[in-house]
Amino acid sequence: MERPVSSSAPTAFTPAGGYGDTSRSRYERELPAQILSDDEALADGVPDLRGTWKVAALLVNGVAAPADHHLWAHFERIEQSGNRVIVVGGGVIHDFASCDGTLENGLHDVMAIDFTTPLQVAARFDDGVLVMRPHGMPVEVKRWREGEQLVWEYSIAFTARLNRIA
């Protein structure tokens, strides 16, 4: 059975070894070409998270992260169409075909940590927040807008504030 996908673009996946020059750190790789069209409408009630974002503030376990923490180098692009969200960053392309809260229509890809460990994630929008729930893990990953910034919260591990760079 084919998964429902918002937009005419086929489901995108992380290539073997991650996207870009695999001899470079996952934070130094050039983002691949945009997958979705800029002119595709969002579904009713879906917040606009689109753009390319760079970490500007970082708390780890509630404390300001040291300058050498790897997440300071993180940048990502979020693409949206209808109820579909694609997060491209850190070497991975995470395409949520439909953010309807089901694993079936969620992400089926690999983890950024090694580009090989399978990852399934259900996602949905709750009161303007994109809430992602990885299968078999007791965590939630959230993204939402606060003014001009994007907030990225990874359970209790870290909270990053990102500024739009494109």
Predicted regions and their residues:
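Edge beta-strands of extracellular beta-sandwich domains
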Residues: 159-165
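Contiguous, well-ordered beta-strand patches that form the walls/edges
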Residues: 58-61, 86-146
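Amphipathic/hydrophobic helical signal segments and adjacent flexible N-terminal regions
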Residues: 1-84, 165-166
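A broad, low-specificity signal marking well-ordered, structured residues that form hydrophobic/aromatic
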Residues: 76, 85, 130, 160
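Short, exposed beta-strand-loop hairpins at the edges of beta-sheets
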Residues: 149-157
